[in-house]
């Protein structure tokens, strides 16, 4: 379970989050839905410790997010933000292997390679496995980024607007895939959405 207790945040006198408390249940997909500027992405970034939490407390699987060592947290939760700093001159296969870094530390095992191959198949990326990210369409790149996060194989997966750059066909297929992978591996997935239509594929 992810427990959020009394989280507040503001910028320049403007309140972004005001004493937010909620429990995200273990297992399944939970959607955070709301208009732009509602603080959804900010809350997600606090869950993943991408910015320091000054007011409130967040625990993930019983771990205090602000106090847990980085190496342990990287094996507990993974996140895909709307903006990433991944070097574009990297192949899709290498990108997915990068998701395994908390485990292999630069020396991939056969198990790491098998996980990457399974992800390439699950996300329909085999055809693009050796292509650079710069050679992909926006939708293909987005699928590769999500596949990288799932290669990390954490119990908790945080996805900020994962359907960006996807047409209706791939958006529907991706939500179906996320639900299947979440259920099969007993993961807890939190997705930030601004569109209510994909909610039918979530659990909450």
Feature locations, PLM:
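The feature captures the beta-strand-to-loop junction immediately N-terminal to the Walker
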Residues: 33-35
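Helix-to-loop junction immediately C-terminal to a conserved catalytic motif
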Residues: 48
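Conserved ABC transporter NBD signature motif
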Residues: 56-64, 73
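Conserved ABC ATPase signature
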Residues: 132-136, 140
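Catalytic Walker B motif of ABC-type/P-loop ATPase nucleotide-binding domains
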Residues: 157-161
């Amino acid at each position: 379970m992810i427990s959020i207790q009394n989280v507040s945040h503001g910028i320049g006198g403007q309140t972004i989050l005001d004493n937010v408390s909620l429990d995200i249940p273990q297992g399944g997909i939970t959607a955070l839905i709301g208009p732009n500027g509602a603080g959804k992405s900010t809350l997600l970034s606090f869950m993943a410790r991408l910015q320091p939490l000054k007011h409130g407390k967040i625990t993930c699987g019983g771990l205090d997010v602000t106090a847990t060592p980085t190496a342990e947290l990287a094996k507990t939760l993974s996140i895909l933000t709307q903006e990433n700093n991944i070097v574009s001159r990297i192949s899709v296969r290498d990108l997915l292997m990068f998701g395994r870094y908390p485990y292999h530390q630069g020396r991939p095992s056969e198990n790491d390679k098998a996980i990457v191959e399974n992800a390439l198949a699950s996300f329909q990326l085999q055809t693009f496995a050796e292509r650079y990210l710069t050679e992909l369409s926006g939708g293909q790149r987005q699928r590769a980024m999500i596949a990288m996060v799932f290669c990390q194989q954490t119990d908790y997966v945080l996805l900020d607007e994962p359907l960006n750059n996807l047409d209706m066909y791939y958006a529907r297929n991706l939500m179906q895939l996320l639900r299947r992978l979440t259920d099969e591996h007993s993961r807890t997935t939190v997705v930030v959405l601004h569109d209510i239509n994909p909610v039918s594929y979530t659990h909450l």
